[in-house]
Amino acid sequence: MARNSVLLGGIFTAWLGAGPALAADLTMAVRTEPSSIDPHFHVYVPNGATAKHVFDALISAGPRGEQMPGLSDRWKVVADDVWEFHLRQGVRFHDGVTFTADDVAFTLARAPVVPNSPSSYSQYTKQIASVEVINPETIRIHTKGPAPGLLWDLMQISIIARHAADGRSTADFNAGRAAIGTGPYRFVSWQPGDRLRMTANPEYWGGVEPWANLTIRPIANDGARVAAMLAGDVDMIEGVPSSDRARLLADPKLALWETDAFRIIYIVMDSARDASPGIADAAGKPMDKNPLRDARVRRAINLAINRPALIDRLLGGQAHAAGQYVPSDNPGASPNLKPSPYDPDGAKRLLAEASWPDGFSVTMASSNDRFPQDAQVAQAVGQMLARIGVKVNVTPMPASQLFSRGSKLEFSMMLSGWVGNGDPASPLTALMATYDPKTGMGPSNRGRWSNAGFDAALGEALQTLDEGKRNALFGRAADIAVADMGVIPVYFTINSWATRKGLKYEGRGDEMSLAMGVKPVK
């Protein structure tokens, strides 16, 4: 399934030839703006992409999730539950203060406890028992047991400056007062709904970027974003709509860049509460009984989804049907799981077995600005469910509202997406582990599905050092989740970007749009 390509004139090719000399400025148009500049406020791709410009992590993430040295230039396992990290020397924050191990310790203490987070970074610190500063250039992380996924977790956590952030709030980051990192760009200003401005860090340890000034503009509407690209108002856009793909491919002034994504589009259902706020009977009368608690109902909804039709007719073939939560060729995928067939008759039988032969009504929320055709996909799923007697009131909204309200359990069903990092622990821990803010498990489990067998398999995997055994345990956890249909896997997206000719972009599986990946063609 893996693919990473540049497309010119409708064919896959290596980029050859030279483009015109570049201006010093770069303007990127993104589908969704961040919910905050605070790098620990919300596990959310727009926030993570923003953070990577201003801050660095101990471990850097390559385009396909490769683990590379970041602020730590080397590390070693001292014991099964102790990791030692040597920090890169000569690194300074944007205000000139030297980066030290104390900043790492401060960061790891702060990241999981930021107030009002819609999806907490506690999921990435859950294995950490304590942090020990050995000296200014060395830190030890003590874990709660063997922690083979620690490096994956540390890839997600931006290191901030104690002297700039101690005692400061998320609002201080948004205003720029605390947004002082070690990253390749310095924060200049943020006008929510309009633009985010940065300037290159001339002393960046990784080398100075080719762009003196960076502007990131949120343009949620697909047509408006494409129009800005065609008019030359921006240098790059993300999320090329499938309906405009052929037109952009044919334009000699542009280039398209595509790669398979880590993003899983899924449906989460309220499987915990006896009464759910968006549930009514087939006539629309509110009920105090929640049919989504029955696994047969959840399996019926899964069988009612025509994945090939969604992908071919609505997404222009720019997706892959999902039968589990990581791609089937990914380490840790279950060999037993394939995308479910479209079977409306089987779905009706399951509803009848569950004592809902006439169906019911439910409200399903979705984003309308987060991933390609998100609101349209939700509407199409609603129409498919209507054919088995489940009447769906689709309620699209901006992603920031969806996640905030979803975290408050305001919805009975949500169609959403999760972008992992290549490690199966990412979606399994975030979306399906039993919700527990004390342990950092299940921070995005907005349906509160809970299964002891799943938790046991996942928990064992998280502490298993042998890679083969670990991956088998991840597969077992996925088998359990799909059998109970705790979360419905729908499809994996394909990420796409367009740039003006003379630029190249290295597409990323995490779908982040990073100025660091935009380079002049030589």
Regions found by a protein language model. Name each.
Residues M1-L8:
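Bacterial N-terminal signal peptides that target proteins for export
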Residues L8-A18:
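Bacterial N-terminal signal peptides
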Residues G19-A23:
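Sec/Tat signal peptide C-region and signal peptidase I cleavage site
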Residues V30-A79, A109, N116, A178-T182:
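N-terminal lobe/hinge region of extracytoplasmic solute-binding protein
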Residues S60-P63, R88-S119, S130-E132, A179, ...:
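Extracytoplasmic/periplasmic ligand-capture domains
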Residues K76, Y121-A165:
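Surface-exposed binding/hinge segments that line
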